[in-house]
Regions:
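Bacterial N-terminal signal peptides that target proteins for export
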Residues: 1-12
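Transmembrane alpha-helix boundary/anchor motif
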Residues: 10, 22, 130-133, 184
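N-terminal secretory/targeting leader peptides
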Residues: 27-121, 138-274
Length: 274
C-alpha cells in the first residue's frame, strides 16, 4: 500500500512538473497593449478583436494582445499617440483628424469629395500612399511611431444634426458642428456657415444631450453604434463627403524588437482586421 501511495505521489509530482513546463513553454514572449477610444459596439473594437485572435493564433501564443477600450489608457488623439511614442501603448487606432496634431499631412484623407467610392479609396490606400505616409510618420516621430495600415472606420462621413433637415449648404448656417482639433475639418464647417466645435469623441453623446454641439460629421455605423439618436441626433444628410480612414499606429520599438517571423504575423494581423 505504501509503495502504491508513493508511486501515486511520484506520478502526480511528475505530471505537475510537465504541466508547469508546458505552461512555461507556451507563455507569451511579447505582449501588445492595444487601445481604441470607442466602445464594444464599435467597428474599431471588432477590428481589435480580429487582430488579437489572429496574432495570438498565428504566433502560437508567442504574442499576447491585451485590449483596452474607451479611455482606459488615453482619451484624445494627441495623448494616445504620445503613449505610442513613449511605449505605454503599443497599438492605437485613430482617424485622420485624431492624428492631425502630430502628423498634419494625414488630413489629406479629409479633403471633401476627393474619392468617389470604396473601390477608389481601397486602391489608393493599398499602395504607395500608405508606404509614403509611414515613412513620413517615422521620420517626424524620430522612429518611434509606425503607421501599420490604413483601413476604414465607419464608412463615409456624413453631416448629421439635432435641429433640422439639411438639403443644401445654406441649411448648415449657424449649426454647432462637432469637429476634432484639426484645420481641415474646421475650415470645411466654417465654409458651410456652421460653427466648428472641437469635442473629444468620448464626450460627444453628452454634448448632444446638453446642446454643447448640435451636429457632427460621422458615418452611419458610428452614429448608430454610439446610440447618438438617443442623445437627440435626428437628421442625417448622406453626402459622403470624406472616406473615414482608420489609421493603425504601433510603437516602432516594440515592432522591431520581435524576430522577423513574428513581425510578419503582426503585419498579417493588421491586414486581417481590414
Amino acid at each position: 500500500m505504501n509503495t502504491f501511495i508513493k508511486t501515486l505521489g511520484v506520478t502526480a509530482f511528475t505530471v505537475g512538473l510537465m504541466a508547469a513546463s508546458t505552461v512555461t513553454a507556451y507563455a507569451a514572449d511579447y505582449t501588445i497593449r492595444a487601445t481604441a477610444n470607442s466602445n464594444e459596439n464599435d467597428e474599431d473594437y471588432d477590428g481589435l478583436v480580429v487582430f488579437k485572435n489572429f496574432v495570438e493564433a498565428a504566433s502560437n501564443g508567442e504574442i499576447a494582445v491585451e485590449l483596452f477600450i474607451g479611455t482606459q489608457l488615453c482619451s484624445k488623439g494627441a495623448e494616445c499617440l504620445q503613449g505610442v511614442a513613449d511605449g505605454s501603448i503599443d497599438v492605437y487606432i485613430s482617424t485622420s483628424g485624431g492624428a492631425a496634431g502630430a502628423f498634419p499631412y494625414v488630413q489629406v484623407l479629409d479633403l471633401p469629395y476627393l474619392m468617389a467610392s470604396d473601390r477608389v479609396a481601397e486602391n489608393v490606400l493599398s499602395g504607395d500612399f500608405t508606404r509614403t505616409m509611414r515613412d513620413m510618420a517615422l521620420k517626424d516621430s524620430a522612429d518611434k511611431i509606425r503607421l501599420m495600415t490604413i483601413g476604414n472606420t465607419g464608412g463615409w462621413r456624413n453631416f448629421a444634426n439635432t435641429k433640422r433637415r439639411v438639403q443644401n449648404p445654406n441649411d448648415m448656417a449657424g449649426l454647432k458642428i462637432r469637429t476634432v482639433v484639426a484645420d481641415l475639418p474646421q475650415e470645411l464647417v466654417k465654409a458651410l456657415g456652421a460653427s466648428p466645435t472641437p469635442i473629444p469623441w468620448p464626450e460627444l453623446f453628452t454634448s448632444f444631450q446638453t446642446g454643447v454641439v448640435e451636429g457632427s460629421k460621422n458615418g452611419i455605423t458610428d452614429i448608430m453604434g454610439m446610440k447618438f439618436p438617443d442623445a437627440g441626433l435626428k437628421y442625417v444628410t448622406l453626402d459622403g463627403h470624406a472616406y473615414m480612414g482608420a489609421l493603425w499606429w504601433m510603437n516602432n520599438e516594440k515592432f522591431l524588437s520581435m524576430p522577423i517571423e513574428l513581425r510578419q504575423v503582426v503585419v498579417d494581423g493588421f491586414a486581417a482586421l481590414q
